[in-house]
Amino acid sequence: MTPLLALFLVALVGLPVAQALDCHVCAYNGENCFNPMRCPAMVSYCMTTRTYYTPTRMKVSKSCVPSCFETVYDGYSKHASTTSCCQYDLCNGAGLATPATLALALILLATLWGLF
């Protein structure tokens, strides 16, 4: 084997291998949903969106997305919602509450407190 070819093979072995992200992907009218799926190669985020129709009724949507912006919308004129993002395999499972979810819970409690 020529020295140049050997050097090329050593360089290839040292390169990191790109691996597709695994996320839960689903839309469910309930507390949570689980459906592990391999995302396309250009996807780098798992996203979870929770839309609250009432304090006890919500829709959870989970997906693979190429870019993601975490948001909290208080639902002044419509439904309240939160979007959270993460970047490791199956990170959008049940897990702990995200800061965005906690902030929305406080907003909903403050709104309910103001109604009584």
Curated annotation (Swiss-Prot):
**Between which residues do disulfide bridges form?**
23-46, 26-33, 39-64, 68-85, 86-91
Record's Gene Ontology CC terms? dendrite; endoplasmic reticulum; plasma membrane; side of membrane; synapse
- Report the source organism: Bos taurus (Bovine)
Protein localization: Cell membrane; Cell projection, Dendrite; Endoplasmic reticulum
Keywords on this record?
Cell membrane, Cell projection, Disulfide bond, Endoplasmic reticulum, Glycoprotein, GPI-anchor, Lipoprotein, Membrane, Signal
All copies of the UPAR/Ly6 domain together span 21-105
What does it do?
Answer: Acts in different tissues through interaction to nicotinic acetylcholine receptors (nAChRs). The proposed role as modulator of nAChR activity seems to be dependent on the nAChR subtype and stoichiometry, and to involve an effect on nAChR trafficking and its cell surface expression, and on single channel properties of the nAChR inserted in the plasma membrane. Modulates functional properties of nicotinic acetylcholine receptors (nAChRs) to prevent excessive excitation, and hence neurodegeneration.
According to UniProt, the name of this protein is Ly-6/neurotoxin-like protein 1
Which stretches of the sequence are propeptide? 93-116
* Residues with a covalently attached lipid (GPI-anchor amidated asparagine): 92
Q: Which InterPro entries match?
A: Ly-6/neurotoxin-like_GPI-ap (IPR051110), LY6_UPA_recep-like (IPR016054), Snake_toxin-like_sf (IPR045860), Toxin/TOLIP (IPR035076)
Assembly and oligomerization: Interacts with nAChRs containing alpha-4:beta-2 (CHRNA4:CHRNB2) and alpha-7 (CHRNA7) subunits. Interacts with CHRNA4 probably in the endoplasmic reticulum prior to nAChR pentameric assembly. Interacts with KCNA2/Potassium voltage-gated channel subfamily A member 2.
GO molecular function (one): acetylcholine receptor inhibitor activity
> What is the topology of this protein in the membrane according to its UniProt annotation?
Lipid-anchor; GPI-anchor
